[in-house]
Amino acid sequence: MNIIRKLKPGTISLVLGPMFAGKTTFLIHCIYMLERLEKKVVFIKSTKNTRDKTIKTHSGIQLRPKQCKIIESTQLSDVGSLTDIHAVVVDEAHFFDDLIKCRTWAEEEKIIILAGLNASFEQKMFPPIVRIFPYCSWVKYIGRTCMKCNQHNACFNVRKNADKTLILAGGSELYVTCCNNCLKNTFIKQLQPIKY
């Protein structure tokens, strides 16, 4: 189904998945489609993501927008006025404590597209994602293959080091995504017991 039919003014769309699944690639695709429809788009990136100063995926795909305005911010409430904007695209949405601000933009008839992790390295959902979820009119899950066994769907993000900081930006040097079997059989030793 054509994604553009789902992206309507006044709606919030959410793309979730583990690291390295292609969420940012999906956002870049949406931006290009919106630009072809002559929509003014703003791309919001968290300053907590210190990996790269450009809009670039883990696989090296880089955003080269025609008109898209790129904003780096710690909080969405610091973004300022978006009166002339048709669509707001937020990458790494789990980094924004005030993600619920997107409701205000949706009420202003903006198209909202969010992408974020399905869970932390502790296998817990991020509170900002939990708070915005009920207001999303469309949710897409993007998966990937386990980086350990290459056989099963990976839905878990596992940190390779013992750092317990909740937000620690990084790529494959710090994280691996794995399936349930590999989580239990290989990585569970570095995690505390998972509580549901």
From Swiss-Prot:
<keyword id="KW-0808">Transferase</keyword>
<keyword id="KW-0067">ATP-binding</keyword>
<comment type="function">
    <text>Phosphorylates thymidine. ASFV replicates in the cytoplasm of infected cells and contains genes encoding a number of enzymes needed for DNA synthesis, including thymidine kinase. Important for growth in swine macrophages in vitro and is a virus virulence factor in swine.</text>
</comment>
<feature type="binding site">
    <location>
        <position position="149"/>
    </location>
    <ligand>
        <name>Zn(2+)</name>
    </ligand>
</feature>
<feature type="binding site">
    <location>
        <position position="146"/>
    </location>
    <ligand>
        <name>Zn(2+)</name>
    </ligand>
</feature>
<dbReference type="InterPro" id="IPR001267">
    <property type="entry name" value="Thymidine_kinase"/>
</dbReference>
<dbReference type="Pfam" id="PF00265">
    <property type="entry name" value="TK"/>
</dbReference>
<feature type="binding site">
    <location>
        <position position="182"/>
    </location>
    <ligand>
        <name>Zn(2+)</name>
    </ligand>
</feature>
<dbReference type="GO" id="GO:0004797">
    <property type="term" value="F:thymidine kinase activity"/>
</dbReference>
<dbReference type="GO" id="GO:0046104">
    <property type="term" value="P:thymidine metabolic process"/>
</dbReference>
<feature type="binding site">
    <location>
        <begin position="166"/>
        <end position="170"/>
    </location>
    <ligand>
        <name>substrate</name>
    </ligand>
</feature>
<dbReference type="InterPro" id="IPR020633">
    <property type="entry name" value="Thymidine_kinase_CS"/>
</dbReference>
<keyword id="KW-0547">Nucleotide-binding</keyword>
<keyword id="KW-0843">Virulence</keyword>
<dbReference type="GO" id="GO:0005524">
    <property type="term" value="F:ATP binding"/>
</dbReference>
<keyword id="KW-0862">Zinc</keyword>
<feature type="binding site">
    <location>
        <begin position="17"/>
        <end position="24"/>
    </location>
    <ligand>
        <name>ATP</name>
    </ligand>
</feature>
<feature type="active site" description="Proton acceptor">
    <location>
        <position position="92"/>
    </location>
</feature>
<keyword id="KW-0237">DNA synthesis</keyword>
<keyword id="KW-0418">Kinase</keyword>
<dbReference type="GO" id="GO:0071897">
    <property type="term" value="P:DNA biosynthetic process"/>
</dbReference>
<feature type="binding site">
    <location>
        <position position="121"/>
    </location>
    <ligand>
        <name>substrate</name>
    </ligand>
</feature>
<dbReference type="InterPro" id="IPR027417">
    <property type="entry name" value="P-loop_NTPase"/>
</dbReference>
<comment type="similarity">
    <text>Belongs to the thymidine kinase family.</text>
</comment>
<dbReference type="GO" id="GO:0046872">
    <property type="term" value="F:metal ion binding"/>
</dbReference>
<keyword id="KW-0479">Metal-binding</keyword>
<protein>
    <recommendedName>
        <fullName>Thymidine kinase</fullName>
        <ecNumber>2.7.1.21</ecNumber>
    </recommendedName>
</protein>
<feature type="binding site">
    <location>
        <position position="179"/>
    </location>
    <ligand>
        <name>Zn(2+)</name>
    </ligand>
</feature>
